Amino acid sequence: MPVFLLLLMLLPSLGQAQTLLALRIGVADLQAEYAVTARERERGLMERTELPANRGMLFRFEDFRRHCLWMKDTPLPLSAAFLDEAGRVVDLIDLEPLSKAIRCSREPARYALEVNRGWFAEQGIDVGARVQGIPGQ
């Protein structure tokens, strides 16, 4: 019986979302989940049916090189920014929901930031903008 009660008390914490990063790009603020491990990057925003406004996911890649994204099992229309090691935007792309097309950065990148489609354009963010708030920077 005590084990059951312990599990019952722990159950709510198992479903809690991870801590969000507070990012800033120019004058725009954004909260982002942080995908660092291979498993987190692979899972990404798959199977999500909504993404709140001013929210996204920041992917950190192990290698600084050209990286690719795809939208398999991701029903949301997204935009992505590829960022260099300093957090500067080096490429912006739009991603089609559920597409298996592979989209790669034009330049080497350390990070990719996925947001709702059109968010970067709405905020006036373009190549060269710098993302602040990335851990370790």
Where are these regions (language model features)?
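Compact, glycine-rich, soluble single-domain proteins
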Residues: A17-Q137
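Bacterial N-terminal signal peptides
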Residues: P2-S13
